[in-house]
């Protein structure tokens, strides 16, 4: 048999498999776009995300709220204009229909972030009268502005069906038209009544979309930004429900952004300004300030110019594959896809997915160094520091890429050895696809964090996977450090 014939047979087989394996539906998921027309970067990122979803033939695009930065009419309409430019007439480039599956978030319907508003609201508990008389904010006519921006009627809770799959779209409307909060501002008004009067397939997945986190799901029990818990109680009656939320801006690399219990919950990453987990020395997390010992020695990772993640769902007859992608790099994967089996069998739970995941490992011969420097802490204050530097632990055929790193300062005095400081740190481009995150990782200690009375100090570094399992350490040679002088010079 000739090579040409063999190739023809192979092509035919591949085509047959492709036809047999045609997915049931495809959906893109974005959140926290925070569109601001005066910032062209945000518009570009949204446009790029929609073009990526067009190229992948999305049947619909979910947007989990915070479409705008300040909740103004101009921002909301700019979002609609970009949608129409990419999907004119709600059509993909191949002519097929694509559905808008959007909801309002707090930035869209709570104009707290406009100049002068936050301080007034914090002091008086209400919005200023002048704000509520403005015609250029979404809050003052949510339905009218939604229709003007997106060419569709608005309802606080909307139901749409796309390719046979139901979507429940629950807008964050926890303020009345006078700017006053409802009795339970962390809950979607009317949600219990909606589910009581709507029925859903008991086996086929259906999707629920809101901005804030259904309590007790993604991010773990200490995650901030959760709702009151009533949503979770409703969805728990539907094991085939899959919820989407935004709000916390977490990266797509977070394994805790997929939760499965009585139902399934997925946290969408942010399209603008990615945030990390709390407590990392160079992390970017609004929760750090609330910690008893917040990170102090390093500036936050700056994800604003180059951090933009999205999800893409492909629905098959027995599973849903969730691609976690980086829009800055054209939709390249930033982490391995999630696979959610349906019906819900619990295999996507934290416990099931974390079990048996190997620890990352440094490459053979990897070395870590420590040196004294004059640096700046997170507040910008100049001071004496110790810089610990090491290469990233990259993936191999048997081990994953490191999620973050634990760095310990180990002090020795006479016969006593003790850990005097422990830090967690990210690689500089932890939110990019691995092949672009190759630079050295640094972790800074204030010189004052190391007790003066020591014979030697060693720094030990361990790579951790996303579930906190540590690989083998690399360590510096023992060294001594002169008596601490907190500020410049040494």
PLM features: residue spans?
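N-terminal active-site segment of His-dependent metallophosphoesterases
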Residues: 19-77
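Beta-strand-rich modules
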Residues: 448-469
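Extended active-site neighborhood of metal-dependent phosphoesterases/phosphodiesterases
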Residues: 73-196, 230-240, 253-304, 308-314, ...
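Signal that preferentially marks extracellular ectodomain short beta-strand elements
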Residues: 432-453
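A short C-terminal boundary segment appended to hydrolase-like catalytic domains
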Residues: 293-424, 470-474, 479-490
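Active-site-proximal beta-strand elements of phosphoester/diester hydrolases
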Residues: 24-37, 164-175, 207-209, 264-270, ...
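Short acidic, glycine-rich surface-loop motifs adjacent to enzyme active sites
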Residues: 195-219
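Solvent-exposed serine/threonine-rich low-complexity stretches and specific carbohydrate-binding patches
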Residues: 417-437
């Amino acid at each position: 048999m000739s090579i040409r014939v063999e190739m023809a047979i192979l092509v035919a087989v591949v085509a047959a498999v492709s036809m047999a394996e045609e997915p049931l539906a495809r959906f893109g998921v974005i959140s926290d776009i925070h569109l601001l027309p005066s910032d062209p970067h945000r518009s570009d990122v949204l446009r790029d995300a929609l073009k990526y979803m067009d190229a992948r033939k999305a049947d619909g695009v979910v947007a989990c709220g915070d479409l705008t930065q300040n909740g103004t009419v101009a921002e909301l309409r700019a979002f609609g204009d970009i949608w129409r430019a990419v999907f004119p007439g709600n059509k993909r480039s191949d002519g097929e229909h694509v559905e808008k599956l959007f909801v309002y978030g707090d930035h869209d319907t709570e104009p707290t972030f406009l100049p002068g508003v936050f301080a007034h609201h914090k002091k008086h508990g209400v919005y200023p009268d002048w704000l509520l008389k403005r015609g250029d904010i979404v809050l003052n006519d949510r339905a009218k502005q939604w229709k003007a921006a997106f060419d569709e009627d608005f309802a606080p809770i909307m139901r749409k069906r796309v390719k046979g799959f139901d979507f429940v779209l629950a807008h964050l409307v926890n303020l009345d038209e006078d700017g006053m909060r409802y009795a339970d501002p962390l809950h979607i008004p009317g949600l219990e009544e909606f589910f009581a009067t709507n029925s859903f397939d008991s086996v086929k997945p259906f999707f629920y979309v809101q901005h804030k986190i259904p309590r007790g799901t993604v991010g773990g029990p200490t995650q901030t930004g959760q709702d009151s818990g009533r949503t979770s109680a409703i969805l728990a009656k539907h094991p085939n429900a899959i919820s989407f939320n935004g709000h916390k801006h977490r990266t797509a690399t977070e394994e805790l952004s997929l939760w499965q219990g009585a139902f399934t919950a997925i946290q969408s990453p942010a399209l603008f300004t990615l945030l990390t987990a709390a407590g990392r020395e160079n992390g970017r997390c609004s929760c750090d300030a609330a910690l008893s010992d917040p990170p102090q020695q390093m500036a936050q990772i700056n994800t604003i110019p180059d951090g933009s993640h999205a999800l893409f769902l492909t629905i098959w007859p027995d599973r849903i594959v969730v691609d976690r992608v980086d829009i800055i790099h054209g939709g390249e994967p930033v982490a391995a896809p999630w696979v959610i089996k349906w019906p819900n069998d619990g295999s996507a739970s934290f416990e099931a997915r974390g079990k048996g995941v190997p620890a990352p490992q440094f490459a053979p011969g990897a070395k870590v160094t420590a040196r004294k420097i004059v640096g700046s802490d997170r507040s910008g204050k100049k001071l004496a520091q110790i810089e610990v530097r090491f290469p990233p632990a990259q993936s191999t055929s048997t081990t994953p890429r490191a999620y973050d790193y634990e760095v310990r300062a180990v002090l020795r005095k006479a016969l006593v050895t003790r850990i005097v400081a422990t830090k967690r740190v990210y690689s500089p481009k932890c939110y990019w696809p691995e092949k672009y995150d190759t630079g050295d990782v640094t972790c800074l200690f204030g010189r004052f964090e190391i007790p003066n009375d020591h014979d030697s100090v060693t720094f030990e570094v361990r790579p951790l996977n996303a579930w906190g399992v540590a690989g083998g350490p690399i360590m510096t040679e023992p060294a001594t450090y002169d008596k601490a002088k907190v500020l410049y010079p040494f």
